[in-house]
Amino acid sequence: MPVRSLSASNSKNAIPLSALRRIWSGELFLKWFCNSTAVMSLGKLPTKTINLLPFLPFLPLPPRPLRVFLFFFTGSSPSFPAALLGLFPSGACSFFTSFS
């Protein structure tokens, strides 16, 4: 049976692999992050992030524009998706959504 979602459990919070590819390429990354900002600001990681954490070491590097974007706003290594761990400043989200 093919794997259709990336999740620690078989739940409705699973991330479909097609969506994960689009998130990782940057297409859905900001939208996903902005929807999770309120949860992250309370010091809690969203369930989707928790399900994704075990797979982080095995994911390829994000494309160059996303690496530069992460480095600019997090100050951390652009080879590591710090935003997925909740280290992203909430101001960056409002900055980018104001242009969309």
From Swiss-Prot:
Provide the topology term for how it sits in the membrane: Single-pass membrane protein
A cellular-component GO term for this protein: membrane
Q: Look up keyword Membrane and say if it applies.
A: yes
The residues that cross the membrane are 68-88
Q: Which domain of life is it from?
A: Eukaryota
Spell out the subcellular localization from the entry.
Membrane
Q: What is its main location?
A: membrane
Q: What keywords sit in the KW lines?
A: Membrane, Transmembrane, Transmembrane helix
Protein name listed in UniProt = Putative uncharacterized protein YDL213W-A
